[in-house]
A protein has these predicted regions:
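Conserved Switch II/interswitch segment of TRAFAC-class P-loop GTPases
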Residues: 51, 58-62, 70-121
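Conserved helix-loop functional segments at active or binding sites
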Residues: 23, 27, 84, 169
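Canonical P-loop GTPase G-domain recognition
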Residues: 102, 112-171
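Flexible loop/turn segments at secondary-structure boundaries
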Residues: 14, 84, 150-151
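Flexible glycine-/small-residue-rich
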Residues: 6-8, 57, 108, 143-146
Length: 171
């Protein structure tokens, strides 16, 4: 099984992406609770290309620092097209570098809200610069909308498939 951390700034769509992956690939989605009311971690296990993948994220940014230990097989970095890379994005990249976790793909989320192609391209360049500063190169970028894909919009669902393809190709 490949353990894939879904990382990025808070509210950039990590949990929505996991829910969408679970729906499209008929995964087994679970919520693991910190206590009786607080979700600690959301995860889904899917089968793809003969392999099993466990995608997970933590509800609080501190969950990554407290629970990741470098045994993860990879990470997907989620960045909102409307916000670009923010402090949580930078921290996720730093944490991956510190723990030796390879970022297998970058998912540019919420693309349905940005009409200007140039703005998305500029934001992608900012993300690429951030990755390059940490020695991370040749990482595929996939544009999409976890929300619309989760609602069954086929053009957006296909982009989730491209994301899973990119992760699988890494291995």
């Amino acid at each position: 099984m490949k353990n894939i951390a879904v990382m990025g700034h808070i509210d950039h769509g990590k949990t929505t992406l996991i829910s969408t992956i679970s729906r499209i690939f008929e995964g087994d989605k679970k919520e693991i609770f910190k206590n009786s009311e607080t979700v600690l971690r959301t995860e889904t296990e899917i089968e793809f290309g003969g392999d099993t993948y466990l995608f997970f994220d933590y509800e609080e940014d501190s969950g990554y620092e407290e629970n990741l230990n470098g045994t993860e097989d990879g990470a997907v970095l989620v960045v909102s097209a409307t916000d670009g890379p923010l402090m949580g994005t930078e921290r996720a990249v730093e944490l991956c570098e510190e723990l030796g976790i390879e970022i297998t793909a970058v998912f540019i989320n919420s693309c349905e809200w940005v009409d200007d192609e140039e703005l998305i391209e500029l934001m992608e360049m900012d993300v690429q610069d951030l990755l390059s500063e940490h020695g991370m190169e040749d990482i595929p970028f996939i544009r999409g909308s976890a929300r619309l894909a989760g609602m069954g919009y086929s053009g957006w669902e296909e982009r989730i498939g491209k994301l899973i393809d990119a992760v699988a190709e890494h291995f």
